[in-house]
Curated annotation (Swiss-Prot):
Official protein name in the record: Protein fyv10
Zinc finger (RING-Gid-type): 329-391
UniProt-listed Pfam families: CTLH
Gene encoding the protein: fyv10
UniProt keyword annotations, A-Z: Cytoplasm, Metal-binding, Nucleus, Zinc, Zinc-finger
Role description: Involved in the proteasome-dependent degradation of fructose-1,6-bisphosphatase.
Family membership: Belongs to the FYV10 family.
Lineage, highest ranks first: Eukaryota, Fungi, Dikarya, Ascomycota, Pezizomycotina
GO CC annotations, alphabetized: cytoplasm; GID complex; nucleus
LisH domain: residues covered: 126-158
Main location: cytoplasm
Annotated organism of origin: Aspergillus clavatus (strain ATCC 1007 / CBS 513.65 / DSM 816 / NCTC 3887 / NRRL 1 / QM 1276 / 107)
rRNA processing is among the record's keywords: no
């Protein structure tokens, strides 16, 4: 009884390992929102304080007319009103993030109030998490409209990152269509964070702009290309010297060249590379997993079920029309077999074997009585013969050998 209670006791901390991004993303968004406020205040302070001091000194020294002083004050008031509007917008964004964080914390706290895996509340909580994982997978796959509709129907809009992934997919799509403007704007907004990134997204985007200028073949624009390289590429000379030297060599090769690496630089596949690079950089900055959370959850379960017989040459039920069994193994299913292919085998501390094991000539082991009963049920096996239920091979009963387990 004690062992049964232990096996069904819920360990909330282990369950929450998969849900770390649930709180990381709002935290990162709140941090970025605060940085935006800080930058706005610093920028306006650097303008207003010197302007106010200058206007006051000019008024005391009678070096400008009252109208000029009023005009200077009006300009400062206008700047401060603009700052107020921006601050109000950022405050609303902060409130939205805080409300989102509150609901996510409440969702995770519910798990700590569930004592057992057998509790009906755990089934309800798990259903919500499954909905979250499915929506996360849909968003990463580009099905943003369907994901949004599902989130609204399930009432979990605050538990999924709709806006984050929608923006990510929009920019990634623009890159696949050959447009760098949105991606560069995103880089400018996250310039400080990108300095710590292990990816060189902004350099690759500027390099692509350089390539597109040269691709025109207009030698008159080569001067523009060199000016672009001097302004945007040379700052990376210490870390990207090889790429910059190749970019310089690109001036001597037409767009239909067959010489590498210039052929690959002109290739349209670079746009797909840039799109994938942006997604990796975006996920890194927001502490998002590079793989869908649904895949991570499935991988853990698949590894617990996988056995050496999975993914063997005999796993497909269609491979042998004489097979008497249909595979219901999730590891071998069409939908999951590729995901499970590189998963490790399950570790079983206990083994369960028949009490009369025998081995067939093909090396497969079965319980003798169970094998004989199954061969009789098939009906197409001659007397004195047995059929391997996995491979469909037929052997003489005399070929069965007893197996002894030490």
């Amino acid at each position: 009884m004690a062992a049964e209670l232990t096996s069904t006791k819920l360990n909330a901390e282990n369950h929450l390992l998969l849900d770390q991004p649930l709180l990381r993303v709002p935290h990162e968004l709140a941090r970025r929102n605060f940085k935006s406020v800080q930058r706005l205040v610093e920028r306006e302070r650097e303008y207003v304080l010197p302007a106010l001091k200058e206007a006051a000194n000019a008024s005391l020294a009678n070096t400008q007319t009252p109208d000029q002083t009023l005009a200077a004050l009006d300009a400062m008031i206008s700047r401060m009103q603009g700052l107020k509007r921006k601050m109000e917008s950022l405050q609303e964004e902060e409130k939205r993030i805080q409300e989102q964080s509150r609901k996510r914390i409440q969702h995770l706290e519910c798990l700590h109030q569930i004592p057992s895996l057998a509790d009906v509340k755990y089934d309800q909580w798990s259903r919500v998490r499954l909905d979250r994982l499915v929506i996360d997978h849909m968003l990463r796959s580009g099905y943003t409209a369907s994901a949004q509709q599902l989130a609204q129907e399930k009432g979990i809009v605050d538990l999924v990152d709709l806006d984050v992934f929608t923006q990510c997919q929009r920019i990634a799509q623009s890159l696949r269509h050959g447009e760098t403007r949105d991606a560069l704007q995103w880089c400018n907004e996250n310039k400080a964070a990108l300095k710590k990134s292990r990816f060189n997204l902004e350099f690759e985007l500027r390099l692509q702009q350089y390539i597109e200028i040269i691709r025109t073949g207009d030698r008159g624009r080569f001067i523009d290309a060199m000016a672009h390289a001097k302004r945007y590429l040379t700052p990376y000379i210490e870390t990207q010297s090889m790429e910059i030297h190749r970019a310089a060599g690109l001036l001597a090769f037409p767009r239909d060249t067959k010489a590498d690496p210039y052929k690959s630089m002109y290739s349209s596949d670079r746009w797909t590379y840039l799109s994938d690079l942006f997604i990796r950089t975006h996920h890194e900055l927001l502490s998002l997993s590079s793989r869908p959370l649904l895949h991570i959850a499935l991988s853990a379960g698949l590894s617990a079920l996988k056995t050496p017989s999975c993914h063997s040459e005999y796993t497909s039920p269609s491979s042998n029309s004489l097979s008497t069994t249909t595979s219901v193994c999730p590891i071998c299913s069409t939908e999951l077999k590729e995901l499970a292919r590189n998963m490790p085998y399950a570790h079983h501390a206990k083994s369960y074997v028949e009490n009369d094991p025998i081995i067939l000539p093909n090396g497969r082991i079965y319980g003798q009585q169970r094998l004989l009963d199954m061969s009789k049920k098939v009906g197409c096996v001659e007397t004195g013969k047995v059929k391997d239920p996995t491979t469909g091979e037929i052997f003489d009963e005399s070929e069965m050998k007893k197996v002894y387990i030490m």
